[in-house]
């Protein structure tokens, strides 16, 4: 433990005084100071000038990261008949209807993304209290309530990331693995920031993006210059 403590302290010292750096500098710093033996996720946290308690200030969207997330995404699909077959063929991990609803109600949630055909929403709607807090509730605004099940499953499996402003106006997500090339991480980060920028709600007042920070799963964070990250 002492050795890990020294590594963590060394990482914090390396980050000291580094603020509002470029995305490239932040990625290089994070990669050079990893102190654990597993492949950490590179995470982004964006503080936005919105209050998501107001409907006209909610920030929600989806972005396909150009280089994927490096994460294996487990996908569940609520569908029947031909659409259920389509979901299975597209690579969905779990496909069902009432049986899947009962599984979720029992507390067994073994998926990271949930997709549904429109006709299944009366069933899925009963699961709002379970799926909602986990940000798993299918929503047409992010393409997870759809008849094009094949495309939705492939997008989820291929590196598509959903985002939503949480309490305090913070949006956070994983944007790749530390093992990715620096250029690929930088590309993913700018794609994510660009998508959040385009999702600016009509009710947002004043500065929309207040702070952007990058970190690894176990490492300290570093703030990134907003104008450098938000390049159209």
Curated annotation (Swiss-Prot):
The keyword Protein biosynthesis does not apply. CDD domains: Ribosomal_L1. One of its GO terms (biological process) is translation. Gene3D superfamilies: 3.30.190.20, 3.40.50.790. Keywords: Repressor, Ribonucleoprotein, Ribosomal protein, RNA-binding, rRNA-binding, Translation regulation, tRNA-binding. Part of the 50S ribosomal subunit. PANTHER family: 54S RIBOSOMAL PROTEIN L1, MITOCHONDRIAL (PTHR36427), LARGE RIBOSOMAL SUBUNIT PROTEIN UL1M (PTHR36427:SF3). Belongs to the universal ribosomal protein uL1 family. This is Large ribosomal subunit protein uL1.
């Amino acid at each position: 433990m002492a050795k890990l403590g020294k590594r963590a302290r060394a990482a914090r010292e390396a980050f000291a005084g580094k603020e509002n750096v470029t995305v490239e500098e932040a990625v290089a710093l994070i990669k050079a100071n990893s102190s654990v033996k597993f492949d950490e996720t590179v995470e982004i946290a964006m503080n936005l000038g919105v209050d998501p308690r107001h409907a006209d200030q909610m920030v929600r969207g989806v972005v396909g990261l150009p280089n994927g997330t490096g994460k294996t995404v487990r996908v569940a699909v609520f569908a029947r008949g031909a659409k259920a077959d389509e979901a299975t063929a597209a690579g969905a991990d779990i496909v069902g209807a009432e049986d899947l609803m009962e599984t979720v109600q029992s507390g067994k949630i073994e998926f990271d993304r949930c997709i549904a055909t429109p006709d299944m929403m009366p069933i899925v709607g009963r699961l709002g209290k379970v799926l909602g807090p986990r940000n798993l509730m299918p929503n047409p605004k992010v393409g997870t309530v759809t008849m094009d099940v094949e495309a939705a499953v492939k997008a989820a499996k291929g590196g598509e990331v959903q985002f939503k402003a949480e309490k305090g106006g913070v949006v956070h997500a994983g944007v790749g693995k530390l093992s990715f090339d620096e250029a690929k991480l930088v590309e993913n980060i700018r794609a994510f920031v660009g998508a959040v920028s385009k999702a600016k709600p009509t009710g947002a007042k004043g500065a929309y993006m207040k702070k952007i920070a990058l970190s690894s799963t176990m490492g300290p964070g570093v703030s990134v210059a907003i104008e450098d990250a938000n390049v159209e």
